[in-house]
Regions:
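Sec-dependent signal peptide recognition
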Residues: 2-8
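N-terminal, motif-rich segments that launch catalysis or mediate targeting to/interaction with membranes
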Residues: 18-128, 135, 140-230
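Residue-level micro-sites within transmembrane alpha helices that shape
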Residues: 2, 130-133
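N-terminal signal peptide c-region/cleavage motif recognized by signal peptidases
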Residues: 14-16
Length: 230
């Protein structure tokens, strides 16, 4: 089940650079559901009491702010400072998105978890694989992943992290998450096989490379408009 879930969660990322606010995570989960085998779908349905992956796709953003899951606050990102290579990034002891995805994947693969804990681990995985593929979640510590890089989005003051987390999906189309999933879930079979064989570290490296391009194209005070999103 783990392999199928990870594969499905990467399909959207391989198709387009997508923002990861609530809708982005919903789209990711919707695409995952489209590619589950019957056996995996049945298993997940049992774990989630019939609720969909989409229902739980944003759960971790809220859970990380509760005392029970406060330890997961740093799991949503991995900071790579300007001038550093990916391998030089400081890996904090509290954990980061790459370590979390790797450890959760290993835990699910090993099996033997009580159903309730297995469901929690799966909810986390659904969300964190999405976070790992948003450029600003591999951003710089000095500006908190773009949160302190002030820009204007179609004239509205905001920050670079919010642009990529939330604004970009809505700029192109006012689609529902299900329509987004339908439109972007179009990888050819050869690409699907390549992504299926991928590993979390490779995904994180790809996101960091894209993040560098985003920073270069979005200096402090940048006016982000039609030429940026076209």
């Amino acid at each position: 089940m783990k392999r199928l879930i990870l594969f499905a969660l990467t399909l959207l990322i391989s198709t387009t650079a997508f923002g990861w606010g609530q809708k982005g995570h919903d789209v990711t989960a919707a695409i995952a559901e489209r590619h589950l085998t019957r056996k995996a779908a049945k298993k997940i349905g049992q774990l989630f009491d019939g609720l969909s992956l989409v229902y739980w796709s944003n759960w971790m953003d809220n859970a990380s702010h509760t005392p029970e899951y406060a330890r997961t606050k740093t799991w949503h990102y991995l900071n790579v400072e300007q001038g550093q290579t990916f391998d030089e990034a400081r890996r904090i002891p509290e954990g980061d998105v790459l370590r979390a995805v790797e450890e959760i994947t290993s835990t699910l693969k090993a099996g033997g978890l009580p159903p309730a804990e297995e469901a929690v681990q799966l909810r986390m995985l659904i969300h964190l694989v999405g976070d790992m593929h948003c450029p600003m979640h591999l951003g710089r510590l000095s500006d908190l992943g773009g949160n302190r890089r002030a820009v204007r989005f179609f004239g509205r003051p905001t920050n670079l992290h919010s642009v990529w987390d939330t604004d970009l999906p809505e700029a192109g189309h006012r689609w529902s998450y299900s329509e987004w999933a339908k439109q972007v879930d179009r990888l050819p079979k050869s690409e699907q096989r390549r992504e299926e064989a991928g590993a979390p570290e490779a995904w994180a490296r790809e996101t960091h490379a894209l993040c560098t391009e985003v920073y270069d194209a979005s200096p402090q005070g940048a006016e982000i408009s039609y030429d940026y999103v076209a």
